[in-house]
UniProtKB/Swiss-Prot annotation:
The protein, known as: 3-deoxy-manno-octulosonate cytidylyltransferase
Lineage of the species this protein comes from: Bacteria, Pseudomonadati, Pseudomonadota, Betaproteobacteria, Burkholderiales
Pathway: Nucleotide-sugar biosynthesis; CMP-3-deoxy-D-manno-octulosonate biosynthesis; CMP-3-deoxy-D-manno-octulosonate from 3-deoxy-D-manno-octulosonate and CTP: step 1/1; Bacterial outer membrane biogenesis; lipopolysaccharide biosynthesis
Keyword entries, A-Z: Cytoplasm, Lipopolysaccharide biosynthesis, Nucleotidyltransferase, Transferase
Family stated for the protein in its record: Belongs to the KdsB family.
EC number assigned by the record: 2.7.7.38
Coiled-coil residues: none
Main location: cytoplasm
Organism per entry: Polaromonas sp. (strain JS666 / ATCC BAA-500)
The keyword Nucleotidyltransferase is assigned to this record: yes
GO BP annotations, alphabetical order: CMP-keto-3-deoxy-D-manno-octulosonic acid biosynthetic process; lipopolysaccharide biosynthetic process
Catalytic activity: 3-deoxy-alpha-D-manno-oct-2-ulosonate + CTP = CMP-3-deoxy-beta-D-manno-octulosonate + diphosphate
Amino acid sequence: MRFTVLIPARLASTRLPNKPLADMGGAPMVVRVAQRAMQSTAARTVVATDSTDIIDKCAAFGVAAVLTRADHPSGSDRLAEACTALGLADDDIVVNVQGDEPLIDPALIDAVARLLNERPDCAMSTAAHSIDQMADLLNPNVVKVVLDARQTALYFSRSPIPAARDFAGKPWWEDGEKGCKLPKPLRHVGIYGYRVGFLRQFPTLPQAPLEQLESLEQLRALWHGHRIAVHITDEAPGPGVDTPEDLARARQFFP
């Protein structure tokens, strides 16, 4: 199985300006992300960016990059342009790794790509991890996902799903008699596998009302009838970088 890792990166960030170029132990963060991705079995890893500064920094560290337009309304549009620039075919698989995940597990990248390859009925794949703390279930910044019997996504939400009616807001998965037989809540991990043909189609689909309500782009795929396969990982995902505090924590791993 061959697949390509694409890492979208742009300098505009409201909470952390110039985030992709933030220094992490002598290399920009986007380079650290690419270096982790290059430890996967991907045939190639490419940064997709609208910044010549990012292109130059990647080149200095031997990381492939492609220059895209600056006016893309979403990361999906940027990835679709990158697929065309790279000459990828519609049946090829790409994995979208976020440019602010310098601790991404290479094995997780492989798992997401492999799952999509094994599920021809799905247009996308992603990952999830079990939730252990009630605070995370209730936190709207922690996106939850519920699955069907084949581990295909039924819905993603910022609200606590599933809602356990009989447990009065308590962590039912800690109930040794009844709750342990029920599904644990799952936290969505923001990594996506796409078939290139669908990735090219995705930006042309009208935004879904539920997507706008939840501010979750993946709901557009479900709304329009496309399936998303979900890999459940036993390893908690490494921390992403959205704020200066996140950056300080992540830098500890790159002395």
